[in-house]
Amino acid sequence: MGDKRGLVLDETATYGTVDRLTGWFRNVCIQLPEGTLLVLCCCAVEQRIGVTTFSIGLSYDLLTGLDPSNPDTVQSPWILTLQVDQKEEYPKGLLLRIPTKQTLKDYWIHQLKEACVSRDGNANRVMSLSNANSQKMWDSLVSHDFKTFWSIMTTILPREKDSGAIRSLPIKVYLPMSNQCIAAIVKPETDDGKLTTIGQSLHSHLPTFFPSETKPVVARAVVHGVEVPLNAVLANLYYMAMYPDGFLHISLVMIN
């Protein structure tokens, strides 16, 4: 996706600020205000630069702020072009260089462990994976082998019907047009034994954005480009829409 000096998009990303990176980007199709957190998903061919933090889908939801309920706002494809032939020094403080694929794998494993600690209070399920299964899981992620990946992923997850026993659901909420991410600690059930809804969780953690538990008034919750109804059971949503790192990433879109 790009010429020999262009970039190859992958599902890994890093970030910097637009105002400090202006000279490195010759074409950003999305209108981004100065200073907005820019999440880039790229690998520059000549310099073999790999970068990682956010998946490109999450980046799109978070940074465009587009309302999925309005089809006229969809922008596809989302094109980011990295200028790699500048005379000035590469901005290594903003766009991280990843030396090897093993570095990416190690980061992903770390995220899996972090999610496991949130669910179980420890990382034993991930640590107990055999080397063969760990490598097989990674290879399937790289090759987009959905069936193989989730056949192993399900072995380190509590069964969905046992979700009530989960210590807390691994959830990260991203505030609109900012660099703030909230790692929410959310129990799958309320104190009275009822299943927690996404509306209850967002109202509890972000009452300014969600003054109501049942109706979006100020912002909408978006996962994988789809608006999530606030009455959705959070545990069910987690099992249906978690990312390959074991987290459910929720971005907020402001209501105009």
Curated annotation (Swiss-Prot):
InterPro entries tied to this protein: Atg5, ATG5_HBR, Atg5_HR, ATG5_UblB
Recorded superkingdom: Eukaryota
Cellular localisation: Preautophagosomal structure membrane
Membrane topology per record: Peripheral membrane protein
Family affiliation: Belongs to the ATG5 family.
Subunit structure: Conjugated with ATG12.
Name of the protein this chain belongs to: Autophagy protein 5
Organism this protein belongs to: Yarrowia lipolytica (strain CLIB 122 / E 150) (Yeast)
Gene: ATG5
